[in-house]
Amino acid sequence: MTSTHFEASYLIETPLAPEAVAEVMAGEQSCGTFTRVAGETDDLRARARAQVLQVQPLGTVERPSLPNAWLARQGYGAGAHWQRARVRVAFPIANVGANLPTLAATVSGNLYDLGEVSGLRLECLDLPPDYRDQFDLPALGVAGTRRSIGAVHGAMVGTIIKPNVGLSAQQTADLVRQLCDAGVDFIKDDEVSANPAHAPLRERIPAVMRVIREHRERTGKWVMVAFNITDETSAMLRHADLVQQEGGSCVMASINWCGLSGIQSLRRHTPLALHAHRNGYGALSRDPMLGMGYQAYQTLWRLAGVDHVHVHGLQGKFAQPDAEVVESAQDCQRRLSAAQDDRVLPAFSSGQWAGTVPATWAALQSDDLLFMAGGGILAHPDGPAAGVLSIRQAWAAVREGSSLDYYAGHAPELGRALQFFGKRG
């Protein structure tokens, strides 16, 4: 990779020659169209045209992955050979500059609608470090989040406000008090609870932060709360200001619905940690021949300056296989910048409890992560405090190389969790 270009890798499917399709992709997303036009000089093409770096054939399939009217009009149907290939393209940085929405439009955009393909997926996005540094950085990232909550080592244990919706502002604050007393490091709103009529942020933020301040005064422990401020941009900025005025340290947004520009504006407006909830990512990712892989996805959002990004959880309740969850977390833990630590905190959630800790540790060999459990804490038979302790005991066990069953011999909270949740698993 050169300092003048960024590179993107794709998985494509087509009945045409993959090499020819790769050239169409490069032209469509730079200075070309379906035919050469006046003004498209050789000099302009040399400066502005994207370059195909590699086409790797992957074999054929019997039928197209996606419908395509353009290919049907060309006569491609039964009997066609649908070829798959990996394509790598280099794009001139000068075409885009430090413009995040245009970067996203360049590496994806109209490529998904190309007539020449029956499948296209953006898999990877690689940026020269100097180019990455033209974009926003996380405010806290991994190390800053640890400092904020006072967790020098070990996984950061979090939970989610449940019931998701329906609690009043005061009821939410009362639940937060219970969760703080249980010993969590982090509490977040659910993605469907932002500014509801029964618990508007103007009431919920002060009520919850009063509890957080009282807990710190009583115990010395600071608990980070991610208030869901998802909304149109100006409202998000107002809500973030209120969180900051009340002494809070984090806000959450449903990034796919707020958009890259909205999150950039939020990042540049507030020093608070941005907890990026990826709900809706499945629409971009679940079909293997369409959408966007997590490496490219998290790269774009990290350029918007988020601090934490959801990756789902191992052995969890959602559709992603464990291998994808692990790869997603590893992507978050890799630096994009050579000059600064721009790693973001992978947020594990969905069906997590003490019993999913060994697989998480085995896959990552790291506890630089946010391990969030709802039922795994709140439904522990001995109460939420025992639920939190069981998760911390599980992390202590894997760090010292012990099995959970062995460690549970002197950790009754873990033993009860294994007995209770294990029967359900």
Where are these regions (language model features)?
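Catalytic alpha/beta core domains of metabolic enzymes, predominantly
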Residues: 238-241, 246-373
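N-terminal capping/small domains of soluble enzymes
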Residues: 1-181
